[in-house]
Amino acid sequence: MDTTTLTDHHFLHILQLASSALPVGAYSYSEGLETLVENGTITSQSTLQQWLEAELSYGAIRLEAAVMVRAYQAATMDDMETLCYWNLWLSAARETQELRNSSWQMGRSLMQLLGKIQPEILPLANAVGNPCNYAIAFGIASAHWQINIQAALLAYLHSWATNLITAGVKLIPLGQTAGQELLLQLQPLISHATVEIMSLKDDELSCCSWGLSLASMQHETQYTRLFRS
């Protein structure tokens, strides 16, 4: 993957956008992981790794990432109609209320933040309106900052994996070293998934997400919860 065209300026932008310090509330979501730990499906570093590898290979994160790419392309061309289309498409593709609400909340938070620190992005934000999915907001920000699209996609998947590993470290629990080891082990698959997602055509967008959806639905009525999803 060629990301050598990233200048220092662009590299710093992608680091900021993918940072866990970005105030969008990602830390409060586990995407059903809390339920999977509660019911004994995920109990260790190895079972967490198996779950994340399956998600990267077949799961809903691939749809999100593919839509992020399309949002980036539409924002680059100021194609408001296409941008709105993919925002609605992704909202319809979310299978549970928690997953939909988390995407909307993070997207809204990112667009509000960008509107304050980069006011020139407001026309795009206003065109998409509310609710705005996080993948859409991330694509708009990456396009605005002229970040290499492959680097933006790599960062999107990496930040997703980082967030869920952090949740797993708290829930299972795991040590911090185990979490970093897992993130390192996922890097080849993240890179491979990036290449695959970049090549997907619109009519090839699909995923196998029934496990995620069932866990998310069960989480809505889980008695004790640390996370919002």
Swiss-Prot record:
It comes from the Bacteria. InterPro entries: UreF, UreF_sf. GO terms for molecular function: nickel cation binding. Keywords: Chaperone, Cytoplasm, Nickel insertion. One of its GO terms (cellular component) is cytoplasm. Its main location: cytoplasm. Gene3D superfamilies: Urease accessory protein UreF. It is found in: Cytoplasm. Belongs to the UreF family. HAMAP family: UreF. Required for maturation of urease via the functional incorporation of the urease nickel metallocenter. UreD, UreF and UreG form a complex that acts as a GTP-hydrolysis-dependent molecular chaperone, activating the urease apoprotein by helping to assemble the nickel containing metallocenter of UreC. The UreE protein probably delivers the nickel. This is Urease accessory protein UreF. The lineage of its organism: Bacteria, Bacillati, Cyanobacteriota, Cyanophyceae, Nostocales. The gene is ureF.
